[in-house]
């Protein structure tokens, strides 16, 4: 899934005009560009969590609200095409990093604070979390971008 999600986003948005990428489909919802910015910021943060778990012995990490991450990155202000290409490159680096891990590294842990009680998480937990989190957004994006059904203009005569 981690490998497929950027490709699915690219497939769903291929040929989409710029105004559609930056247009809110429904009042109060995110634009296509906002969704990509959110996924990039989550991937950055969870990738850093996994790297910290491997670099340190059971580090304590502070969870950050996804909306805060989104605002800190500036990804929303980027043009969609270059941002998607950056996401694809970032994902390739993350996958190369994860594929090189020895089996025992997937169980390395961290204590995560913020957003509730402290909890212990593993590298595997965050890799799975990221894949499932993205998949939900990609599915929603696919539904949002589906063309509206054609209306039957015949009057029944």
Regions found by a protein language model. Name each.
Residues 17, 54, 99-102, 145:
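A structural signal for long alpha-helical coiled-coils and helix-turn connectors
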Residues 2-7, 12, 69-107:
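Acidic/histidine-rich alpha-helical segments that form the ligand environment
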Residues 17, 65, 79, 102-104, ...:
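General structural signal for secondary-structure boundaries
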Residues 22-67, 95, 107-157:
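Short, contiguous alpha-helical
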Residues 4, 11, 15-18, 24-26:
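A glycine-rich, hydrophobic loop/mini-helix early in the fold
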Residues 11-15, 58-60, 75, 145-146:
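Short acidic/polar alpha-helix capping motifs at helix-coil junctions
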């Amino acid at each position: 899934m981690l490998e497929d999600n950027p490709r699915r986003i690219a497939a769903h948005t291929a040929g989409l005009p710029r105004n559609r990428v930056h247009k809110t489909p429904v009042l109060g919802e995110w634009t296509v560009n906002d969704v990509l910015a959110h996924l990039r910021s989550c991937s950055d943060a969870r990738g850093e969590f996994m790297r910290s778990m491997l670099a340190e012995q059971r580090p304590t990490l502070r969870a950050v609200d996804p909306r805060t991450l989104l605002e800190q990155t500036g990804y929303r202000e980027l043009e969609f095409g270059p941002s998607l290409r950056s996401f694809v490159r970032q994902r390739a680096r993350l996958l190369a990093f994860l594929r090189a891990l020895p089996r025992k590294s997937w169980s390395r842990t961290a204590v995560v604070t913020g957003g509730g009680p402290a909890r212990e998480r593993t590298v595997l937990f965050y890799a799975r979390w990221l894949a499932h989190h993205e998949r939900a957004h990609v599915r929603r994006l696919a539904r949002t971008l589906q063309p509206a059904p054609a209306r039957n203009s015949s009057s029944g005569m």
